[in-house]
């Protein structure tokens, strides 16, 4: 599904991504973790060209995403992206937030778009809020609407960039449950997150990043029980609860 071939990215003299050579399989749930400033968010944003790379090659579903003549808007319409901030259109209702893009970019009729949106809002537990405005929702509810809005385009790939980091602690669980349900449905997902419990329970693989490199790639079982790289060992030691369970 996604291949990184010797990908490099710089911010001035800072080497933000250093020689990334990795692959994400179709249907895989990948969690990317690591300390702040490790390159996690930069990496995920290169997948739909929100961040430009300095060198290397990225392919998504066999498409070189830097190929000349690529219709970037059309390409991005096939990738769902959920950010730290919810980025809902404040002047549109929940339902209209979820129907706008399918009508404009997929050619759905208003009725078709609403039927799809209402089914997705039901899936994330918010069908009863379809007529509400974003300002009337909690942070967790807004993020669930953002997920439903992304899914309304029926993307084969979903990207999550720390989707719970801006939420109050009591709202995190409701968003993670929606993500768990997506993972169980076979969606290809790349998730940048500090939610290690989610990584342990849901991910097929974990990448650990530091200083712009993927230092470790492993199953959750191996990563949490038997981390190989010293930096990964230190990271897990720093985030473990007093009871020795990943936070």
What are the language-model segments listed below?
Residues 1-220:
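ABC family nucleotide-binding domain
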């Amino acid at each position: 599904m996604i291949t990184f071939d010797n990908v490099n990215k710089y911010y001035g003299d800072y080497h933000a991504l250093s020689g990334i050579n990795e692959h994400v399989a179709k249907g895989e749930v990948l969690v990317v973790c690591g300390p702040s400033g490790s390159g996690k968010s930069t990496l995920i944003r290169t997948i739909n060209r929100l961040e430009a790379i300095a060198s290397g090659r990225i392919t998504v579903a066999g498409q070189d995403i830097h190929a000349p003549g690529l219709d970037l808007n059309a390409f991005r319409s096939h990738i769902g992206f959920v950010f730290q901030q919810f980025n809902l259109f404040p002047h549109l209702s929940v339902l209209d937030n979820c129907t706008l893009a399918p009508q404009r970019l997929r050619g759905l009729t208003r009725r078709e778009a609403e039927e799809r949106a209402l089914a997705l809002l039901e899936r994330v537990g918010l069908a009863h809020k379809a007529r509400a405005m974003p300002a009337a929702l909690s942070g967790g509810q807004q993020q669930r609407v953002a997920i439903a809005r992304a899914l309304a385009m029926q993307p084969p790939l979903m990207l999550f960039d720390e989707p719970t980091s801006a939420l109050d602690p009591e709202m995190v669980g409701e968003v993670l449950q929606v993500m768990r349900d997506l993972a169980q449905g076979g969606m290809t997902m790349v998730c940048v997150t500090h939610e290690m419990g989610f990584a342990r329970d849901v991910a097929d693989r974990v990448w650990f990043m530091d200083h712009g490199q993927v230092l470790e790639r492993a199953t959750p079982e191996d990563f949490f029980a038997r981390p190989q790289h010293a930096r990964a060992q230190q990271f897990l030691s720093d985030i473990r609860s007093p009871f020795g369970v990943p936070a």
